From Swiss-Prot:
Glycans are attached at residues 180, 393. Residues 1-15 form the signal peptide. Its cofactor is heme. It comes from the Eukaryota. Transmembrane segments: none annotated. Coiled coil: none annotated. It comes from Petromyces alliaceus. Its EC number is 1.-.-.-. Heme binds at residue 448. Keywords: Antibiotic biosynthesis, Glycoprotein, Heme, Iron, Metal-binding, Monooxygenase, Oxidoreductase, Signal. This is Cytochrome P450 monooxygenase buaG. Pathway: Mycotoxin biosynthesis.
Amino acid sequence: MFLLILYAFLTAVVARKLSAAVSVYRYRKMHGLLLARPLNQKGDVIGFSLFRGMQKSAREGLSLQRHYENTQQHGPTISAVLLGKSFISTSDPENIKAVLATQFQDFNLGERNDAFAPFLGRGIFTEDGPEWERSRALIRPSLSKAQVAELPIIEQHVQNLLSRIPGDGSTVDLQQLFFNFTLDSATHSLLGQPVGFQLSPAGSEAERFSRAFDDAQAFLQVRAKLGPFRGLVRNKAFEVNCQLVHSAVDRYVSEALGRSARPRSEDGKPGSMRYDLLSELASTMTDRTQIRNELLNVLLAARDTTASLLSSVFFMLARHPRVWSRLQQEVVQLEGQRPTYDKLREMRYVRAVLNEALRLFPPVPTNIRCATCHTSLPRGGGVDGLQPVFVANGTIVHYSIWTMHRSTAIYGSDAEEYRPERWLQESDEAPLRPGWGFLPFSGGPRICLGQQKALTEAAYVVIRMLQTFATVQSRDQRPWREHMGLVLSSFHGVQVALRHVEG
């Protein structure tokens, strides 16, 4: 009996494999598709050695750079097997455009929901299909122009930030301060009141919330990398951190549901027509868990993306005094006044500095999608790598914004250099129009709703820093190394020294 059952099982497996192979053959023949160039994985049938190599690179803070170097050898689009799953890796802008926009319906987030669910639940960054569309529609109103331009709230938290930065030339890690600042500004914008981390003493509830938030999201990256094996790993600290963050946000949700939604002013008090996201959600939903999930999904992006950008900006400014000096020349035109929303838009060099930091250090430097059907990508097949390639149902497509942003075909021979002027038409060189070659905030239907808010806040902080400090110097000459959480940051922080403007 046992042998009969085993025989039936093996027969079913073989039949399923043959059926899949026939399906692939017919689809490829019908559409004239080639296969992407395979990575040499001799003896590594399930891709475990590849996984170990990737983990080693990540520990060394070099995974992004090594991917870029590999594309110089193998081309921008390759196929491989990783932990038993077929995947294609690409940095070709046409392929990324297909995945994110023109063939959007052929791909979903894959296992992201399972990996992130214990912390983020179901929300805009973990859902697909109608549920994602519903979440996006709920969140969009809170990121209108009126919300983007809430400069008085930003100023309040900038003052707290500036009070924490020594101006006597002593060394400070700006990266940590920026993440503290954006936690306050993001929670103020989303919850109607800040957690108050910047002004809280060590051991406070706000500090515990911040630490739990950071540690929980860091472990999400581990869960994502473990793929189908994530269920075998239990992390008690992760569970405790999730519970702490959930309990804290649930208190805000309960307060919001306990009162009717009402107009709020820019400082969060009753008065004008400003609504924070929590009030918006509480006025249209009653499911406490779903409200919390949506808030955490947006908080993760709103807080970490801006902090990542600011850290990259000042990491480079501390090493490029010429750029700092030119920024000063532009900012001095404000004559010490706080920038208005209209003035922010006029600061062309400030925007160029932000764009160059986003190019070299995109906050989300890589991402993945999963094919939901047999489909294709525009390029990567054939000897020249320019022919369409087949993508089987279930294939993981990994795309690297980091590598694409270093393409000499898009950015010229100096693509690896830091040069904000490339974004300004100031010489005989052709104006830079990278199109789908510049995606710091993704693209297509899932493009980041908060990109203007992030750019506004980052520009405001840069200008206020320039108005406060006369000089900035690097106090760490080690080369930049990545720290990959859900967003990119510097492994060594941003160790600098600043001196106050005299008078």
